[in-house]
Amino acid sequence: MATPSAAFEALMNGVTSWNVPEDAVPCELLLIGEASFPVMVNDMGQVLIAASSYGRGRLVVVSHEDYLVEAQLTPFLLNAVGWLCSSPGAPVGVHPSLAPLAKILEGSGVEAKVEPEVKDSLGVYCIDAYNETMTEKLVKFMKRGGGLLIGGQAWDWANQGDDERVLFTFPGNLVTSVAGVYFTDNKGDTSFFKVSKKMPKIPVLVSCEDDLSEDRDELLHGISELDITNSDCFPSQLLVHGALAFPLGLDSYHGCVIAAARYGRGRVVVTGHKVLFTVGKLGPFLLNAVRWLDAGRRGKIVVQTELRTLSGLLAVGGIDTSIEPNLTSDASVYCFEPVSDVGVKELQEFVAEGGGLFVGAQAWWWAFKNPGVSPLARFPGNLLLNPFGISITSQSLNPGPFRTPKAGIRTYHFRSTLAEFQVIMGRKRGNVEKGWLAKLGPDGAAFLQIPAEEIPAYMSVHRLLRKLLSRYRLPVATRENPVINDCCRGAMLSLATGLAHSGSDLSLLVPEIEDMYSSPYLRPSESPITVEVNCNNPGTRYCWMSTGLYIPGRQIIEVSLPEAAASADLKIQIGCHTDDLTRASKLFRGPLVINRCCLDKPTKSITCLWGGLLYIIVPQSSKLGTVPVTIKGAVRAPYYKLGETTQEEWKRQIQENPGPWGELATDNIILTVPTANLRTLENPEPLLRLWDEVMQAVARLGAEPFPLRLPQRIVADVQISVGWMHAGYPIMCHLESVQELINEKLIRTKGLWGPVHELGRNQQRQEWEFPPHTTEATCNLWCVYVHETVLGIPRGRANIALWPPVREKRVRIYLGKGPNVKNWNAWTALETYLQLQEAFGWEPFIRLFTEYRNQTNLPTDNVDKMNLWVKMFSHQVQKNLAPFFEAWAWPIQKEVATSLAYLPEWEENIMKLYLLTQMPH
C-alpha cells in the first residue's frame, strides 16, 4: 500500500485550484486511526476531502455529493479514480444518484458506467453517502481490494432526523468509519481554500462530545466511582488520545485507569491491568461494559481462557460467556489480555466492522524488562490499541477509588487540552482547568513516543508541537528559579523533551539561558573517544555500565560498536537522574531528563535535550565480554575506580575533565555526584575502601555473595520524586546528602543511616516482608548491622529513635493501646526484630535469609508469611517463639502454635517483662 504522502501527491497531481460549487455547503470530516489523511483543508483547519485505506482497498471521501458531479473538479476526480483503482483498466461503477459523474469520467477516457449495485468486477465504485441498503457490500468490496469514492454531507441529514448521533447513525459513516473517516454535522466553511503542496495537518480537535456522552452515561450507569483499593495490583496509566476515546476512571492527577472508545462501527474498553477483570467491586461496571460492547446484539461473549474469573463475575449478572483461547468468528465481544502482536490486524478489523473488544493489560513490567524501548511504540497491547486512541503507558497508578466523569463537568482529555494550550500559546493569555497543563506535558511526551512516520494523525501533532515550541525559548528550571509545573512553561519542559527524543530538530528548542553544561560551553572532543565497556552481566536484571563520558545538552552524538554487539540487546542511556518529576508542583529541573535507545545498529545517533553522563545498558545474563564503543560528540568526566585509577590519574581528571558530574566506583557501589564536590577529594581510596566494607556487611546480612554480582548505585540530584532519599536502581538522594556520601571522616563519626536505610530497602524481599507494616522497618536492620559491625557506632547513638528509653516508651505505648497489628509499623515493628537480634545475635537472621533464598512456592499473603517467619525463626534458634509473637499481636495460626509446642519455651522473652509491668489499658 502506498504511503499517505505518496497517495496525497497522486491525488493532487495537476490540481491547481478547488472550484467547488458555491451553493453546496459541505460538512466537516473527522479523521481517526492510522490510515486516514486529509486532502482538502480550508483556512479554518476543517477537513473537507479525505482519503484512507481498509483491508486491500482504498477510500476517498468528499464532504458534499455535488463535488462529485462538478465538472470543474475533473482533474481531482480523475486522480481519485486512478488512485482508487488497484486493477488498471478495471471499469468504474457509478451509482444512479451520481449519474453525471459517469459522463465526466467517460469524457476523459475512463471506462465508467451507471451501476445500481456494487460488483466484484468493478475497480472503483462511486456513490453518495445516503444509501442505507449496501453498507455491508460496500465494506466487503473495499476490504477485498476495491476503491470507493463517496460523497455527502451530514449536517442537513441531522437536522431532518431525530437521532442526533450522526457519527454512529449517518448511513455514510457506517461505511467510511471502518477506514477512520466520519461525516460530522459541523458545517464546513468554503470562503477560502488553497491547494496544498504537501499534506495538510489534521486538526487537533473536532467537536464530537455530544456523540460520546450517551456512551459514557451507559457505561457508568449506576456507578459513582471505580474502586480498586484492595485489588492488590498497580494498573498502568492509560493515555487517552483519540478523538473518539474517552476516560472513565481518573485519579486526582487526572491519571486514567479505564477508558473506552468508538472505532469504525465497533467499540473498545481498556483497563490498565487484567486483574481489574477480577475485582468484585467493579462487577457492576464490568456488566455495563460488556453490555455496551455488545451494542444490543445479545451476541456471543468470548472470554480468553486465562481470564476465566471474569466469566464467573459476568455470570452473576446474567451474562453467559464462552471461554476460548482466541477470538472466534461468531463473537460479538472478546475479552482478553494482549500478550503478543499476533492477530493485531484481525482484531482491528473485528472492531472496525462492529465488534466489541474488552482489553486488560499493564505495560510497566514490560517496560522494566525492556529498558530503552518505549512501550508506546513496541508493547504488544499498544500495537493493537494505538489506532483506537487509547495507549497503555509504563506509568503505574496507585490502587484506590477513581472518580468517574460527571455530566456537565469538563473532564481532562489530551486533545482538548492540547487545543487550549495552542490557543494560549498563540495569544499569550487564557487558562485551563487546574492540573490539566501539568498532565498535558507528560501525556504529550508519551504521545510523541508513538511512531509517527507516515501516520498523518500522529504527524500532525508533531508538527503542531514543533511549531508552538519553536516560537518561544524553553524555560530553564533551577532551584533558584523553579518552574511551576501546572502552567504553559511547565508543559513546555515535558513537551520539549518528548520532541527531542522523537527526533525533532534540536535547533528549534532553544533555552532562555544557555547553561554551562550545554554544548556551546562544554566543547565536545573533535576526535571520537573509544572506551572499553565490560558487557558481562551475571545479574538477574539489566545494569548500567559507566563510560566516564558526559554528553552536553542538545548535543547529537554518534555511537559506533562492533557488528556482533549491535545484535546483543545493548542499549545506550544519556543521563543518570531517572526520577520522574511530572507530578511535582514545582520543578528545579526538567521533569524527565534521561534518554535511552537501543543499540541495534553498528552506528547510531542519539541526543538528550538536557545532557548527562553516558551509560551502556547491558541485559541480564550477558556474556559479551569487553566491547569497544566509540562516541563522537562527548566530553570526559571524572571517574575513579578503586584498584584501577591511580592518585595521579585522579588529580589530572578533576583538573582536566570538564564533565559536570563524576563517579566514584568499586565493584560493589558507584556514587554519582557533582564534579564540584569531587574536586575536594584528593584521594578517594580510603573512602571507597570504607564503602566496600559497608557493602560487604550489607551483603553478609542479606546472605548475598560478595563481591556483589552487580554494584549498587547512589545518585545525587537537585530534585527527586519522593522523600529525602529513596531506594531503587539507582538509589536517589538530594545534593545536600553528597557530603554524607563522600566525606570519610563524617561517615566514621556520624554514621551513614540514610544511605544504608535505602540499601536495606533494596535488600528487602517480598517473601519475608509484610507490607505496609515492615516497609520502613526491616530495612533498618541493615542500618543497625552496618553501624555496629563496620563503623563501631552503637544503635542508640546511630539513631535517636533507638535510644533505650525511647524504645521502651514506644513498646509501652503500643501495649498500652492494646496490641494490634494495625498499629505495628515502622519503628514499632523494628523493635520486634531488634529484641530477637539482641537475644540471639545476627546469625539466625543470616541463616534465615539464606533459607528464604533457597525456597520456592512461598506464601504471598501477610498472615501466611508471618506464620512462616515464626516457624522458621523458631527452628533457627530452637525455641518456641509463638508466645513472643502473640505478645506483639501477630496473627499466629493455631496449627502453627501447636507445631512449635515441642520446642523449649523462651524463658528470656522480654515481652513477658513488659506485660508483667504494663499498666492495665
Swiss-Prot record:
The record ties this protein, via InterPro entries, to: Class_I_gatase-like, M60-like_N, Pep_M60_3, Peptidase_M60_dom, TCAF
Q: Name one GO cellular component term.
A: plasma membrane
Task: Keyword check for Transport, yes or no.
Answer: yes
Q: Which UniProt keywords apply?
A: Cell membrane, Membrane, Transport
Which GO MF terms does the UniProt record name? transmembrane transporter binding
Q: Which PROSITE patterns does this entry report, sorted A to Z?
A: PEPTIDASE_M60
Chief subcellular location equals membrane
List the transmembrane segments: none
- List residues of the Peptidase M60 domain: 542-841
Quote the subcellular location field of this record.
Cell membrane
Record's family?
Answer: Belongs to the TCAF family.
Can you state the subunit structure given in the record? Interacts with TRPM8 (via N-terminus and C-terminus domains); the interaction inhibits TRPM8 channel activity. Interacts with TRPV6.
PANTHER family xref list = EXPERIMENTAL AUTOIMMUNE PROSTATITIS ANTIGEN 2-RELATED, TRPM8 CHANNEL-ASSOCIATED FACTOR 1
| Reported function | Positively regulates the plasma membrane cation channel TRPM8 activity. Involved in the recruitment of TRPM8 to the cell surface. Promotes prostate cancer cell migration inhibition in a TRPM8-dependent manner.
State the domain notes: The C-terminal region is necessary for the channel activity stimulation.
Q: This chain belongs to which protein, by name?
A: TRPM8 channel-associated factor 1
Q: Which organism is it from?
A: Bos taurus (Bovine)
The top of its lineage is: Eukaryota, Metazoa, Chordata, Craniata, Vertebrata
